[in-house]
Amino acid sequence: AEIERIFSEQKPNIVVIVVESLSSSYMGLYGRKETWTPFLDELAKDSFLYSNVYAIGTRTVRGLEAVSLNVPPTPGQAIVRRPDCGGLHTAGTPLREIGYKTQFLYGGYGYFDNMNTYFEGNGYEIRDRTDIPQEEIFFSTIWGVADEILFDLSIKELDKHYETQQPCMQIIMTTTNHRPFTFPEGKAPNAPQGKREGVVKYTDWSIVKFINDAKSKPWFDNTIFVITADHNSSAAGEVTLPVNKYKIPCIIYAPKLIEPGKNNRLMSQIDIMPTLFGMVGLSYKTKNMGYDINKLPEGEERIFISTYQLMGYIHNDKLVILSPQRRVQTYKIDDYKESGYTKIDNDPQLTDEAVTWYQSASYLYKNSLLKEKE
């Protein structure tokens, strides 16, 4: 009942920070000896951590699709980039039904990769580089404004919604962690310019600056911050679909609403929002395929990992890879950390499960069954 009350009475703001290429392998939190994310490692101690979460793909649009639409990756193009990508039942739908404003904030130009079309078509107000006054853009790259500038925009929007007493859900997509790896000087400690290490340290610094700035705001106590990634920095490896190259953080920080804790169960990027909604007691009807991990029976955990061509499905420590021309390969996963695989005979039941999940996502999309209205 306590949990139900968070939603029915308080309607917290939900701020989902999708960090460009924030691989768990950069973080002390996930065992890196010389951490690149000292601030996030520290923040995680006061947060609820889902420590075993995997991205569905290798592209930003896939990550945004997983977080917003909560479906496995469809073969070929991401739904975000397809023509009929509006009017879908996304994570914002149940929130708008109870009076929320939903927004998508992006540090670059949102027409890139069809993001504006997708988010606008699904009821999100767009705030991107074009909404930031030129004089405030003291640093940018070809990809977008420095992350700290994007986070300042988020705070301004949350201030506005607080004044009109409208709860708000934001999906924020950062851009600084891209080549050429340049970022504002003199902010993050020990951050070398032009190197991935430097830019990750800068982004880490800017997220915690954002949260510290938010702490002085009247809406802070009633705001939930979710920090995750769109994908890993590289999914190339010795083996096809190396599972360790898909591991991403999922940190939920809301000191007044959610007790710190940790859940180590295997979890997909498509499960993040359904799980969060479960934590704060939002009950809603959904057409999506993500699980609330806290309500899922043991043994039913499954994840999806994909590239443009290959679709991987992992269940009970076995990986099935479906590739074009109906080729199927099956592996036993001996080690998630190093992607240690042993090839095994195909398991017809597991193959069927994989095919069913992937075909269902395509079927629902193609037949307009992911739409909000029948």
Language model regions located:
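Membrane-interface soluble catalytic domains
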Residues: 258-374
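Soluble catalytic regions of membrane-associated enzymes that act on cell-envelope
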Residues: 1-288, 297-308
